């Protein structure tokens, strides 16, 4: 069984609704692909705040999409996980043993809707971007900065790669997120 973008989005919606039933305000936070889900929720709900950490928000390059299609046509169903983009020595990211290509395809397809509606994000937004990210191009954060309709602040992470929550800037990142949320909820 393959999990799709619709499954992830439905699960995020359910979690948001469950939290909204218990909390007065809900902030959404996402790393990488989770950034797409954060945008998806913020585009559809009156979230209190958004935090994006090295988010995937825009359509992938055409050659990447075509390469994925070629692999699927050739019968390749999975690839090795995209993992380990961590600068800090000795830190290992826990991942699935492989990534199903059809699931990645549904994520790629969903990116058009996410990218096209970035301007509908009106919540206060914090964007944390690693200067040296080998997984998600910085154009994703640039697009959010250019199109987000709400107040937005970008903080650069100078000593981390893609998985910044486990990297050298993790404590700084945590402090920035907590300070931002304290200001929003003050």
Language-model segments: what does each one mean?
Residues 1-22:
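Catalytic nucleophile-loop/oxyanion-hole region of alpha/beta-hydrolase
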Residues 142, 146-163:
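Catalytic histidine neighborhood in serine/cysteine hydrolases
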Residues 47-77:
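Flexible "cap/lid" loop of the alpha/beta hydrolase fold
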Residues 159-186:
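Catalytic active-site module of serine/aspartate enzymes centered on a nucleophile-bearing elbow/loop
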Residues 30-34, 38:
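Gly/Ala-rich beta-loop-alpha elbow adjacent to hydrolase catalytic centers
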Residues 121, 127-129, 133:
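Short beta-strand/loop motif that positions the catalytic acidic residue
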Residues 100-117, 123:
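Active-site nucleophile elbow and catalytic-triad environment of alpha/beta-hydrolase enzymes
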Residues 123, 137-146:
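Short alpha-helix in the alpha/beta-hydrolase fold that links the catalytic acid
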């Amino acid at each position: 069984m393959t999990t799709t973008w619709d499954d992830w989005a439905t699960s995020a919606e359910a979690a948001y609704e469950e939290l909204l039933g218990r909390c007065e305000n809900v902030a959404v936070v996402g790393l990488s692909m989770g950034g797409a889900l954060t945008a998806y929720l913020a585009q559809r709900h009156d979230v209190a705040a958004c935090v994006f950490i090295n988010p995937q928000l825009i359509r992938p390059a055409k050659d990447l999409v075509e390469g994925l299609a070629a692999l699927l046509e050739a019968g390749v169903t999975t690839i090795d996980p995209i993992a380990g983009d961590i600068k800090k020595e000795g830190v290992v990211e826990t991942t699935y043993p492989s990534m199903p290509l059809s699931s990645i395809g549904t994520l790629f397809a969903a990116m058009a809707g996410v990218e096209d509606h970035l301007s509908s994000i009106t919540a206060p937004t914090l964007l944390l971007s690693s200067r040296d990210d080998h997984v998600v191009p910085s154009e994703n954060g640039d697009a959010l900065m250019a199109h987000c309709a709400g107040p937005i602040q970008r903080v650069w992470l100078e000593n981390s790669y893609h998985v910044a929550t486990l990297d050298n800037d993790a404590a700084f990142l945590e402090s920035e997120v907590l300070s931002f949320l304290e200001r929003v909820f003050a």
